[in-house]
């Protein structure tokens, strides 16, 4: 399970260090794709296979299903870690997430998310304000 928040910078070649604690769980490679709210989702290959199986069941007759799968898969890339624990991010994903230099890597259960630091701070501040209300709306999961 992924958790925690880590700050790292993109290097001049567009590579990002993924913390060792997360890499240990991910393995030698991962799949990165467009995430929600302007971040990048990163999945271990085993989790990606589960998502692929679910997406394959979406009906091609539904416009939203076609649109979502196009964007989700067209932005996807498999990335391997180099010896320093860095992963090379595609220009498409960097643009989607607004990544320039400072990044925040967030562990979120079965995936990691990569955010531009500024965007993460805005999102986090807003989400913190409504955290209690969100928890009440999700009371059926009984935390």
UniProtKB/Swiss-Prot annotation:
Record's subcellular location: Cytoplasm, Nucleoid
GO cellular component terms, semicolon-separated: cytoplasm; nucleoid
Record keyword Electron transport present: no
Molecular functions (GO terms): DNA-binding transcription factor activity; transcription cis-regulatory region binding
Swiss-Prot/TrEMBL keywords: Cytoplasm, DNA-binding, Repeat, Transcription, Transcription regulation
One of the GO biological process terms: negative regulation of DNA-templated transcription initiation
Start and end residues of each SpoVT-AbrB domain: 5-47, 76-119
Family annotation (PROSITE patterns): SPOVT_ABRB
PANTHER family assigned: TRANSCRIPTIONAL REGULATOR MRAZ
Subunit structure: Forms oligomers.
Family annotation (NCBIfam families): division/cell wall cluster transcriptional repressor MraZ
Family: Belongs to the MraZ family.
Name of the featured protein: Transcriptional regulator MraZ
Biological source species: Lactobacillus delbrueckii subsp. bulgaricus (strain ATCC 11842 / DSM 20081 / BCRC 10696 / JCM 1002 / NBRC 13953 / NCIMB 11778 / NCTC 12712 / WDCM 00102 / Lb 14)
Gene that specifies this protein: mraZ
């Amino acid at each position: 399970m992924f958790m925690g928040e880590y700050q790292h910078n993109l290097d001049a070649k567009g590579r990002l260090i993924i913390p060792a604690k997360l890499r240990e769980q991910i393995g030698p490679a991962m799949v990165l794709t467009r995430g929600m709210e302007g971040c990048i989702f990163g999945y271990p290959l085993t989790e990606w296979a589960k998502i692929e199986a679910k997406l394959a069941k979406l009906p091609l007759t539904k416009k939203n299903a076609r649109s979502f799968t196009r964007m989700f898969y067209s932005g996807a890339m498999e990335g391997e870690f180099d010896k320093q624990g860095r992963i090379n991010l595609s220009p498409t994903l960097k643009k989607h997430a607004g990544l320039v230099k400072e990044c925040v890597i967030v562990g979120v259960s079965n995936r990691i998310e990569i955010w531009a630091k500024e965007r993460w701070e805005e999102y986090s501040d807003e989400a913190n304000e409504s955290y209690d209300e969100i928890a009440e709306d999700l009371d059926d999961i009984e935390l």
